[in-house]
Amino acid sequence: MFISRTTANDQGPVMRQASDVTPTWLSAVLGQPVARVSVQPGTGNWSQQATLQVELHDGTLQTLRLKLCLGQTFGRSEVDYYTRDYVGLAGAPLVRCFAAHFESGVGYHLLLEDLSATHHDRRDVLPTRDYGFSVAQALAAMHRHHWQTQPAPNEATLNRYLDEVRPGIAAFEAATGRAVQSRYAVHEQAFRQRWADARGMSLLHGDLNPTNVLTPKAADHPVYFLDRQPFEWSLTYGLAVYDLAYAMAPWWPEPIFRDHAQAILRHWYDSLNRPDYSWDQAQDDWRLSVAQCLDVPLEWCSKEDTLTKMRWLWEAQWTRIEAAIGSP
């Protein structure tokens, strides 16, 4: 089970640094007078993060997380994730959002509830079947909420996405000595053909890596999903089962994936409960989506700095995904 915690105000302009946060601004956002706030800088892969220790005038203490994504590469997808896309979904697996604002060409900020005292991400926790069921059930609810509500992505959208991946092919081949160009061409053709058909599509999270999933420190559920994929080139609508494939194939140890993937896929399918979408089609889409996960290490390889700096990650991802492709 999971608990809805979504509320948000569109509070602009976009914060440029954590020190811009003031008691006056927080008072307006929280709807309660704030006496003082202390800011503790944090880290993020593509963002600036900070923990805010907030003291209200009545002495109540509250901990919040500020996230700043600044620059022209960021779209408004993550702001919509908190302020629009799942507001009407009971039980949406999102942490509470108090404020969010996006400006084109500038970026966005988010002010989120901080659950670090009671919850942790899944980076250092071995996945289990029960955890997989929790993720699958939460994703099914989100996918059902926007099931087949849009046309399939157009060719320009797919091209923009693939243009981010393709430069990584030659770099991957040079770094590893493995030829993948012809294999990728076959996959791209299958990908384009299937993604031209809107069956089985929904809004996507796009980046359910283990650091973007929170659970209680002593349990595998409920789950909360953070940090929707924020880039302008990201695919925000497409084959729904890709979210589940990406949450597992690049990250799960191979024996655990092999033993539990089909049961978790079936739990997602049963929880989705869409009679217009057959189990056979879901399995076909799963296989294509697991193969699509190879785009992740290729995208790492597409940029010179991450080709080297993130080799420890993308090589491990490639190995796991290859094993997942070969799993029954």
Task: Show which residues each predicted segment covers.
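Active-site catalytic-loop/activation-segment of kinase and kinase-like phosphoryl-transfer enzymes
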Residues: 3-5, 144-194
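Conserved NTP-binding catalytic cores of kinases and kinase-like/nucleotidyltransferase enzymes
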Residues: 1-106, 216-223, 234, 328
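Conserved kinase catalytic-core helix
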Residues: 121-155
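Conserved structural core of kinase catalytic domains
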Residues: 99-134
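Catalytic-loop of the protein kinase fold
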Residues: 203-206, 210
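Active-site activation/catalytic loop segments of kinase-like enzymes and analogous catalytic loops
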Residues: 80, 237-274, 290-312
